[in-house]
Curated annotation (Swiss-Prot):
Tagged with keyword Zinc-finger: yes
The name this protein goes by in its record: RING finger protein narya
Extra information: Nenya, narya and vilya contain a RING-type zinc finger domain and are named after the Three Rings of Power given by the elves of Eregion in J.R.R. Tolkien's books.
Tissue expression remark: Expressed in nurse cell and pro-oocytes (at protein level).
Biased composition, class Basic and acidic residues, residue ranges: 153-165
Organism, as annotated: Drosophila melanogaster
Length: 211
């Protein structure tokens, strides 16, 4: 801690406690008598800047009173502040690092999911192709079975009593059909042949026969 004194006449506050001391805006300490001499010029007697001062007492603002406080106290506060802010920066960096790790993990999982999706899509395509082939195979064999059942059903109808009866009826009817019966022209030809035969037989026996 320093001793408060006038920076112009070097008067100490402890020596003349009744004399007021002032702190200028340019950070100089000036006693009341020296300040009175400079107030007419309105300039700091040490640096010549515009004079603007505040009296040093217990009613000073905190921002001004801190210039007269023990610097060790501020050093301790500074250490605490520095440690607090350093811890906060470390915590922020740790959070950022963990977020980065989580991001990398999510990226790997996403790549794995994308690969799995591609494999599943390929599997779906293969299964659809396999299903189409199976449907074609099933349709082919169902059609073959239907054709086989039709042939088998047709073969069984030939051996039923109704089919045999109908078959025999058709045969007997065809035997007696007009095509098998002698026609009129055939009968005429037969009669003519018979008459000529008779003539020939009678002509040979009755030659010279007279009534």
């Amino acid at each position: 801690m320093f001793r408060v004194h006038c920076n112009k006449c070097f008067r100490h506050r402890k020596t003349d406690p009744a004399v007021p001391f002032h702190l200028t805006q340019c950070r100089h300490v000036i006693c009341g008598p020296c300040l009175g001499q400079s107030s007419l010029e309105k300039n700091c007697p040490l640096c010549g800047q515009v004079l603007k001062a505040i009296q040093i007492n217990r009613d000073m603002p905190t921002s001004v009173a801190n210039y007269f406080a023990d610097p060790l106290r501020f050093q301790q506060i500074y250490r605490k502040i520095s440690k607090f802010q350093a811890d906060q920066r470390a915590s922020d960096n740790l959070g950022f690092y963990r977020q980065l790790q989580q991001l990398e993990q999510n990226k790997r999982q996403l790549e794995g999911f994308c690969k799995m999706e591609a494999q599943l899509n390929q599997k779906v395509v293969e299964e659809k192709k396999r299903i189409a082939e199976l449907r074609t195979y099933i349709a082919y064999h169902e059609n073959a079975q239907r054709m086989t059942r039709r042939r088998h059903s047709a073969g069984e109808r030939f051996h039923t009593p109704e089919f045999k009866e109908a078959w025999n009826t058709s045969i007997s009817t065809s035997d007696k059909s007009p095509s098998d019966m002698p026609s009129d022209s055939s009968r005429r030809s037969a009669d003519l042949d018979t008459q000529s035969t008779r003539r020939r037989s009678f002509g040979s026996d009755t030659k010279g026969f007279r009534l």
